[in-house]
């Protein structure tokens, strides 16, 4: 059963992200570059947060279990804040690059729209986040058939796969909403992204029940997805045309700057 569990959980966690990459990004080299750059920014944010957390552990040098738990929570909160700071830094970089391309040839619109860049960068953040959070767990599913934690839920791998999926998709939605907030100077939008990110990342410290955490995370994902859909220019009419395959110029395939 270990091999079916491995492939099943892998497809659950990374299947939708791979499909998005294959159909919306892989055909355009420029989008692939922006995706890799977004993944790199997330990696750097992880490196910095790991360094800070390691330094705090060395400085405190306390082996008390309760103190270690507080340090773990502190590390998670710090990591989320640094990730959002790097999302902001990546937006600033993309904005400068877009303005530079427009200044080179102002008569021809060669720069991708910021909404498209928000989607691509968010997917880059999400894929790299999912890989680092789930690959070790996924490798354990190959054998000897246990996660190594006595009394843990038998649905541990399945729950982890669905949680990885929701985090990847949330990064996509967070990216779209975050960039829109930066474009329109709506700082409450950035705060909302930060707070929802904190809730999803720290809810496991508040509740030991996987089902509760998954339901909460998926509710947040649906709400953020609806928000991202509308700020990206979507509407009920465009959604209807898309589902009926009648819209030839739908959202991310529209190359015009909005």
From Swiss-Prot:
Pfam families per record: Aph-1
InterPro entries given in the database record: Aph-1
Task of the protein: Potential subunit of the gamma-secretase complex, an endoprotease complex that catalyzes the intramembrane cleavage of integral proteins such as Notch receptors and APP (amyloid-beta precursor protein).
GO cellular component: gamma-secretase complex; membrane; plasma membrane; synapse
Membrane topology: Multi-pass membrane protein
Subunit structure: Potential component of the gamma-secretase complex.
Keyword Nucleus in record: no
Coiled-coil annotated residue ranges, if any: none
Protein's recorded name: Putative gamma-secretase subunit APH-1C
Transmembrane segments: 5-25, 32-52, 71-91, 116-136, 161-181, 187-207, 214-234
Primary location: membrane
Example of a GO biological process term: Notch signaling pathway
Family: Belongs to the APH-1 family.
Places the protein is found: Membrane
NAD among keywords: no
Gene name as annotated: Aph1c
Protein keywords: Membrane, Notch signaling pathway, Transmembrane, Transmembrane helix
């Amino acid at each position: 059963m270990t091999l079916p569990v491995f492939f099943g959980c892998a497809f659950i966690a990374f299947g939708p992200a791979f499909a998005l990459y294959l159909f919306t990004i892989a055909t355009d080299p420029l989008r692939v570059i922006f995706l890799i750059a977004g993944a790199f920014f997330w990696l750097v944010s992880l490196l910095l947060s790991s360094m800070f957390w390691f330094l705090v552990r060395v400085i405190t040098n306390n082996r008390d279990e309760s103190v270690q738990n507080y340090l773990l929570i502190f590390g998670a909160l710090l990591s989320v804040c640094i990730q959002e700071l790097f999302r902001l830094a990546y937006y600033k970089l993309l904005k400068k690059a877009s303005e530079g391309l427009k200044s080179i040839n102002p008569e021809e619109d060669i720069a991708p729209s910021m909404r498209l860049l928000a989607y691509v960068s968010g997917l880059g953040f999400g894929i790299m986040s999912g890989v680092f959070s789930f690959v070790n767990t996924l490798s354990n599913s190959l054998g000897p058939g246990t996660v190594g934690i006595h009394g843990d839920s038998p649905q541990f791998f399945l729950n982890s796969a669905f949680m990885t999926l929701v985090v990847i998709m949330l990064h996509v939605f967070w990216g779209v909403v975050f960039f829109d907030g930066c474009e329109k100077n709506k700082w409450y939008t950035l705060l909302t992204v930060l707070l929802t990110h904190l809730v999803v990342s720290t809810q496991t410290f508040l509740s030991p029940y996987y089902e509760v955490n998954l339901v909460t995370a998926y509710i947040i994902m649906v709400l953020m997805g609806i928000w991202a859909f509308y700020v990206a220019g979507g509407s009920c009419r465009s959604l209807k045309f898309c589902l009926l395959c009648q819209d030839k110029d739908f959202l991310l395939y529209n190359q015009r700057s909005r």
